[in-house]
């Protein structure tokens, strides 16, 4: 097996020490760690840009003690969930929502309080309920882990962070919707030949810990191996990348799948999402995807398209019924994956607010309806940003629990039916 050496090292790992608390506030949207201007993190065509409440008892709620043993040597664990084919699973999904700029925020100085580092409030059951009650049945929870992990070779996850992630997952999982957990702003898996082995070791360690903690959850929980794996800070960061980067991402997808499967139990048949380079919707990136050998895979794609309307802050505020890019994307996804029995989830999409709700409504109706025709569920990127100079993809006002754009919300829900 590809991971025989990597997983042997992982099996011996425990959990690390909490980081020192501090203060760090960064404003705005789909930020990538290390950028000087967080609000302008995504500029490529089509790609990215205190908890309370009653909840059902969840599997795996073992607290810190369980996390500390989450990387113990793998042993046989009973499978307790239905074996659902990925195409059948995705057919049950309608429309989704991202808890953006929250657990995916990055800081190396404030520990678990990083959830609020980018200006968003602490996630609550009420927030998740507000979304689900509108008709969303997929909740994607982006999580950044690098600042909550120890050093090699153990890469221990901070127990309090794992506990908090599980708490937020349970807010949605307890409502019976589909939940996607990923690893988000991680610069350590830079996809180069030079970094490939180190990235594989850390990726396997991290996913062994995550998968072990959530092993008893049923088919409603989906793992997404990486967010937008790419060569950050280089001339080939976005869109197609380069051949080396695309090949290494394919390799790391295989590492992710093998690490999860090795934890046993429900994870042997859990449906997993894998991206291509940068999760790009470009032709070259999609055509370069080589899927791992596995029967429970879903392709992950991000598509803020057409770019000049949806993602480019300096672009158009009118849609003008420009369906070409959307149509081409769906046709390509069908050719490469859907027609071959491999489902696709558009894990991030959206059109930023340019004081143009009517235009966004028309665009959303077409985009989601077209995706629905092909059986592709779409997950709106919501960073809780509504005005200012940044990327304003807010849908739910999380402080007031209101929806400032009711017609856009209606268009998303109705078009997914």
Model-derived segments and spans:
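Ser/Thr/Gly/Pro-rich low-complexity, disordered linker/stalk segments of secreted
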Residues: 23-75
């Amino acid at each position: 097996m590809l991971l025989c050496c990597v997983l042997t090292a992982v099996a011996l790992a425990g959990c690390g020490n909490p980081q020192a608390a501090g203060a760090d506030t960064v404003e705005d949207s789909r930020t990538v760690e290390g950028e000087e201007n967080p609000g302008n993190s995504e500029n490529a065509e089509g790609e990215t840009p205190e908890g309370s409440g009653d909840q059902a008892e969840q599997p795996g709620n073992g607290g810190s003690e369980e996390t500390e043993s989450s990387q113990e040597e793998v042993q046989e664990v009973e499978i307790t969930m239905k074996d659902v084919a990925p195409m059948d699973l995705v057919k049950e999904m309608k429309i989704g929502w991202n808890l953006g700029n929250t657990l995916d925020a990055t800081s190396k100085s404030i520990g678990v309080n990083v959830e609020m580092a980018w200006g968003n409030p602490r996630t609550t059951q009420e927030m998740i309920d507000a979304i689900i009650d509108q008709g969303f049945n997929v909740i994607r929870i982006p999580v950044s882990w690098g600042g909550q992990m120890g050093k090699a070779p153990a890469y221990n996850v901070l127990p309090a962070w794992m506990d908090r992630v599980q708490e937020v997952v349970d807010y949605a999982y307890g409502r019976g919707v589909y939940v996607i957990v990923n690893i988000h702003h991680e610069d350590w898996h830079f996809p180069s030949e030079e970094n490939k082995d180190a990235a594989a070791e850390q990726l396997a360690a991290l996913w062994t810990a995550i998968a072990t903690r959530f092993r008893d959850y049923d088919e409603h929980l989906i793992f997404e191996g990486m967010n937008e794996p790419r060569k950050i800070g280089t001339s080939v960061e976005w869109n197609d990348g380069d051949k080396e980067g695309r090949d290494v991402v394919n390799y790391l997808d295989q590492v992710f799948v093998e690490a999860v499967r090795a934890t046993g139990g429900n994870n042997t048949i859990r449906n997993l999402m894998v991206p291509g380079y940068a999760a790009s919707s470009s032709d070259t990136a999609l055509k370069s995807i080589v899927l791992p050998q596995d029967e429970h895979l879903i392709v992950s794609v991000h598509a803020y398209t057409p770019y000049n309307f949806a993602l480019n802050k300096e672009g158009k505020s009118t849609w003008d019924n420009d369906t070409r890019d959307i149509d081409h994307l769906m046709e390509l996804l069908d050719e490469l994956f859907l027609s071959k029995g491999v489902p696709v989830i558009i894990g991030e999409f959206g059109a930023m607010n340019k004081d143009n709700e009517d235009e966004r409504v028309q665009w959303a109706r077409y985009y989601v309806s077209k995706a629905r025709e092909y059986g592709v569920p779409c997950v709106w990127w919501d960073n809780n940003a509504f005005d200012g100079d940044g990327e304003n993809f807010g849908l739910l006002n999380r402080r007031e629990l209101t929806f400032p754009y009711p017609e856009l919300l209606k268009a998303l829900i109705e078009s997914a039916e």
